[in-house]
Amino acid sequence: MKLINNPDRSQWAEILKRPVMNTENLFDTVRGIIDRVKSDGDRAVLEMEAKFDKAELTSLAVTEAELKEAETLVDEKLKAAIRLAKQNIETFHAAQRFEGKKVETMPGVTCWQKAVAIEKVGLYIPGGTAPLFSTVLMLAVPAKIAGCKEIVLCTPPDKEGRVHPAILFAAQVAGVNRIFKAGGVQAIASMAYGTESVPKVYKIFGPGNQYVTAAKQLVSLRDVAIDMPAGPSEVEVLADETANPVFVAADLLSQAEHGVDSQAMLITTSEDLQQAVKEEVERQLELLPRKEIAEKSLASSKLIVVKDMEEAIELTNEYAPEHLIVETADYMQVAERVVNAGSVFLGSLSPESAGDYASGTNHTLPTNGYAKAYSGVSLDSFIRKITFQEIRPEGMKNIGPAIEEMAANEHLDAHKNAVTVRLKTI
């Protein structure tokens, strides 16, 4: 980890740079896979599963027998943990339900919104170095609450053609309708365009590597919506001298073990804490089974000391982290001033891991500074709001002349006439 003390503002942009994930050079490769899936459907996906995931499959769909078997393979303690997490995620997201109100903007003119679920959604759950069954809950639970009629899930199988049982169990608990053995670009293409087995969906959710990210970008240009721009995962700890270095180091490492391109940052007002955290990270790193991954991630991570909390908050808002842990004496007051972050964890007993798994908030969040403009996944991500308006005779008399005047000045005579012909009948 790099130690930085009292950087000049002119250095901030360089200091806050993320590990680069360049998808531009991948587009030709990714486009070729997408085109194969569009033209050859299941056959193309099966061939690519054999090529990329080394899985010789005869069909893509997960069977009822596989789902029943998965339930017997998951440890009872893990089942209980998944059910608890599902309950909290459900409680938090159910509280986000939209209640539209009719508004009379002026006499005779009534406007309102209605929330409608996206009918078909696709969830992508990576395989990779860890089975992300928690992401199944984070995406499927709000989709179910929203009322999505078809919830499709794609996830890569192992070399034996099996999906991790915890992923299958979580999918059943959360209410996923159909599950398919497909990973990477071919999974995204399958959900974007449909195959003989995989239905076409209207919006695709879920994390993935640079190939998945590039695929989502390409299919979203004109064919299907996606959740948000994605990049490597990241955490920032914002701390003062009261922070526990053991906790801070543990939080930084919990992010670093995600992947070699993840980033962990400490911004603090205390040089003593900076040094203590460095030593504690080195100590805890030696104990991690995923030490090699975390070690590579830490190469792009930084421990930064600034002159005061004012500057720490300003630097934090400039960084706009995916996850922000505030471990200061006055963390509630500090939190009030945070305007750019995906999800914020307050106080010494609120690790990022809580939001990753079971507190109830969603862990599908904007990365790479997109927290300045994007929200994380919520119930709103799975719905559309349709606007309605009803104009009665009194309303047409009230707003008709204004519409005519505005349309005439924009030289849109047909727009004006649509009002004029109605006014003549009132």
Give the positions of each predicted feature.
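Short acidic-hydrophobic, aromatic-tinged amphipathic segments that line or gate anion-handling sites
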Residues: 1-7, 178-183, 303-308
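Conserved NAD(P)+-binding/catalytic subdomain of aldehyde/semialdehyde dehydrogenases
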Residues: 175-263
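N-terminal Rossmann-like NAD(P)+-binding subdomain of aldehyde/semialdehyde dehydrogenases
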Residues: 1-119
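Conserved small-residue-rich beta-alpha loop and adjacent elements
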Residues: 103-169
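Flexible, glycine/charged-enriched surface loops at secondary-structure junctions
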Residues: 98-105, 225, 262-267, 287-297, ...
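C-terminal core of ALDH-fold dehydrogenases
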Residues: 318-426
